[in-house]
Amino acid sequence: MLLVIDNFDSFTYNLVQYFGQLGEQPCIYRNNAITVEEALALNPDRVMISPGPCSPNEAGVSLAMIAAFAGKKPLLGVCLGHQSIGQYFGGTVVRAERLMHGKTSPVRHRNTDIFSGLPNPMVATRYHSLLVERASLPDCLEVTAETDAGEIMGLAHKDLPVWGVQFHPESIATDDGGPGGMQLLENFLKL
């Protein structure tokens, strides 16, 4: 079972639908409707922290869920979830120089883990005004994808099964409508 922490974002259910198409049965809780103890009692196979309209500090139990599950279950953060992972492990989330709402960018990646087998570069759809500051990235995290301008679009923990993507794999514009976004989510389910 995939536990989804919903940060009150309309894109969350696009992700849920994609995971359903991949044969997963997501269990969805709003970030103010479940405690860490309740989540641990569910004993999910993996956890996803969803996008959302705020900062990690305003994302309900998202940071606490990362603390509870990192190293115990595979964990994926998308957009706000990605920022929450960066912040939890010691990075700084800052206002982006360019607001990217409904815009696409070419993203280069390492072709490993969640990016395995994806086009490189791939087209990624972005909806964010915050990002993880590259200079603040702690030693335990590594950049797995970035824009030509050096903005972090993917990160991974060096020792734990924790990944984040700043962009939206569920967007139809990601990978120019190709299978890349779905493949990224499928890769997560296999890790």
Predicted features along the sequence, with ranges:
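Catalytic nucleophile loop
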Residues: 82
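A generic structural motif
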Residues: 23-27
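Short, charged N-terminal beta->alpha structural module
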Residues: 2-22
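Local cysteine-cluster metal-coordination motifs and their immediate loop/turn environment
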Residues: 85
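Amide-donor transfer/coupling interface in amidating biosynthetic enzymes
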Residues: 2-4, 11, 28, 33-44, ...
